[in-house]
């Protein structure tokens, strides 16, 4: 069944059940038909584009999108299509899937070519604009440099010598030098342009000769080229196989290299741990050596004290018993006398405090009497 027949059957079934369906289903049906119509429209435009490439412009039939008909004509055309679909006469033959696939592939290839041309044009325009920007930057740098030189060489001298003839001559000389340099630059650019034109002519001539030589190739040359192409393809296949083998060997080498790298990483970690442990052991050894030196010093001091004590012990002579008893009794008597004198001193201090208080009272009383006496006079 073709697209026209399916569309006519759908339209008949939709018209027959249009009064029976609710509004929601009608909206869904309209949306579905709109999607189908948009897909068919895109496909029809692609077919018309391909058909337009095959036929000359004067022999092309008008496109469906270019045909402008009224609503009545469209209804009449639709009714005529329905009658044709009902009778089953004059059915058009649709495209097969392979033909549609071929058309789509050609359309995709054309789109890729257009995209490539567009990209090439865009790159060329971009390079052109970049060259213009670069030239503008170069010109701007030259103008800035010339302005700086003019300000440094001319304006400073003019500001110092206003109204003098030397300043005017200097400006004129600067302008003449600038014109001379510009003429020299113009001549260089003209010569370069001439040489570039000559090179362009040579390249065009070589290209034309190559095209003529390529057009003059015969069947024998094409057969030779086919043979060489086959040989090159065999060589490329062999090189691809070698490249595959090299990739496999490279993969194995990378695996071995990764294994050795992991081993090296582990060895480096062990080395770092051992290095840290060696540093800790060295610090511990230095600490032990310091403690050993301190112990040696303490031992030497203890030996010296021990020798001194032994010497004192050897020289020590205990007193006799009676002498010791007498000294002990004398010591006890002295302690008793010390305690007795301490009590006497405390008693004397207390009596001294009492006498001081009495003296202070007497002194205060005397001062009051003197004050009263002086006041009575």
Swiss-Prot record:
GO terms for biological process: cilium assembly. The keyword Coiled coil applies. The keyword Translocase does not apply. GO terms for cellular component: axoneme; centriolar satellite; ciliary basal body; protein-containing complex. Keywords: Cell projection, Cilium biogenesis/degradation, Coiled coil, Cytoplasm, Cytoskeleton. It comes from the Eukaryota. It holds the Pfam family CCDC113_CCDC96_CC. It is found in: Cytoplasm, Cytoskeleton, Microtubule organizing center, Centrosome, Centriolar satellite; Cell projection, Cilium. Residues 95-243, 280-354 form a coiled coil. Belongs to the CFAP263 family. Component of centriolar satellites contributing to primary cilium formation. In complex with CFAP263, acts as a regulator of ciliary beating that connects radial spoke 3 (RS3) to the inner dynein arm (IDA) and the nexin-dynein regulatory complex (N-DRC). The complex is positioned parallel to N-DRC and forms a connection between the arch at the base of RS3, the IDA tail and N-DRC. Forms a complex with CFAP184; the interaction is required for functional activity in cilia. Interacts with HAP1 and PCM1. This is Cilia- and flagella-associated protein 263. It comes from Homo sapiens (Human).
């Amino acid at each position: 069944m073709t697209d026209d027949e399916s569309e006519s059957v759908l339209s008949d079934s939709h018209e027959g059940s249009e009064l029976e369906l609710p509004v929601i289903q009608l909206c869904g049906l309209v949306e579905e038909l709109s999607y189908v119509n948009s897909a068919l429209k895109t496909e029809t435009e692609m077919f018309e584009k391909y058909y337009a490439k095959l036929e000359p412009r004067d022999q092309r039939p008008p496109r469906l999108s270019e045909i402008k008909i009224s609503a009545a004509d469209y209804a009449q055309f639709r009714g005529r299509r329905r009658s044709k679909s009902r009778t089953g006469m004059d059915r058009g033959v649709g495209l097969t899937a392979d033909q549609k696939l071929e058309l789509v592939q050609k359309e995709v290839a054309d789109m890729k070519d257009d995209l490539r041309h567009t990209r090439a044009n865009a790159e060329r325009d971009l390079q052109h604009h970049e060259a213009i920007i670069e030239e503008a930057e170069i010109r701007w740098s030259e103008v800035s440099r010339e302005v700086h030189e003019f300000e440094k060489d001319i304006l400073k001298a003019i500001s110092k010598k206003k109204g003098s003839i030397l300043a005017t001559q200097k400006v004129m000389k600067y302008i003449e030098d600038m014109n001379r340099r510009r003429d020299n630059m113009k001549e260089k650019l003209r010569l370069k342009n001439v040489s570039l034109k000559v090179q362009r002519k040579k390249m065009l001539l070589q290209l034309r000769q190559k095209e003529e030589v390529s057009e003059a190739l015969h069947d024998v040359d094409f057969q030779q080229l086919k043979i060489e192409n086959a040989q090159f393809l065999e060589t490329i296949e062999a090189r691809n196989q070698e490249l595959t083998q090299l990739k496999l060997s490279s993969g194995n080498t990378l695996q071995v290299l990764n294994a050795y790298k992991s081993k090296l990483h582990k060895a480096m970690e062990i080395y770092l741990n051992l290095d840290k442990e060696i540093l800790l052991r060295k610090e511990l050894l230095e600490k032990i050596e310091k403690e050993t030196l301190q112990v040696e010093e303490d031992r030497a001091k203890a030996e010296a004290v021990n020798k001194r004590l032994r010497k004192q012990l050897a020289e020590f002579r205990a007193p006799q018993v009676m002498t010791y008893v007498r000294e002990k009794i004398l010591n006890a008597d002295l302690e008793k006398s010390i305690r007795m004198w301490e009590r006497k001193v405390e008693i004397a201090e207390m009596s001294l405090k009492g006498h001081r208080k009495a003296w202070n009272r007497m002194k205060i009383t005397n001062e009051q009497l003197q004050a009263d006496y002086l006041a009575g006079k």
